[in-house]
């Protein structure tokens, strides 16, 4: 129920930012994916519907080329499948992903403000510094490794948090948005808080 509410607000944020438009070309594709995943995870139908809807919207906005859409659609299908596989296998892993994502964002913000220094990609993320990013990466790496994960996997997961954040920051800059919404006062919207886990879950 909580996850469904979170995803509902994400959809609302995308609608408010005018991300949602002209998706009628994807009704058939949406239906096929919906049926496929329903067979695999019949008890997660509402959450899956929300996720697919969100990412079909993103595909429509950012990938006007037909073949790119198909390639990206496959990657999104993998993402959704992995996400709900995690939920069904072990909810503790799901909660761990949320915790690591929150920890990484918080550390990057705090140390970026304290130490400051040069920015990484000012044109995309004007507040993200090298100091905050490196410290959050190192601490996240050790936390992930502490829970019996191989060191290489821990590194990949820690790096993925950064790229998820940058990816959604790029989307916002392309659409002249500071945040997806102001639902969380001073912290943007729900989607702004969950962006870093996008590639984390896929890995």
Each model region followed by its residue ranges:
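Membrane-embedded alpha-helical bundles of polytopic integral membrane proteins
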Residues: 1-127, 133-158
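Residue-level preference for nonpolar/small residues embedded in alpha-helices
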Residues: 103, 163-164
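Cytosolic, membrane-interface loops and tails of multi-pass inner-membrane proteins
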Residues: 106-128, 167-189
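Short amphipathic alpha-helical surface patches that serve as generic macromolecular interface elements
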Residues: 153-156, 164-168
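Hydrophobic transmembrane alpha-helical segments of multi-pass transport and channel proteins
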Residues: 159-163, 190-194
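Final/C-terminal transmembrane alpha-helix of multipass membrane proteins
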Residues: 193-203
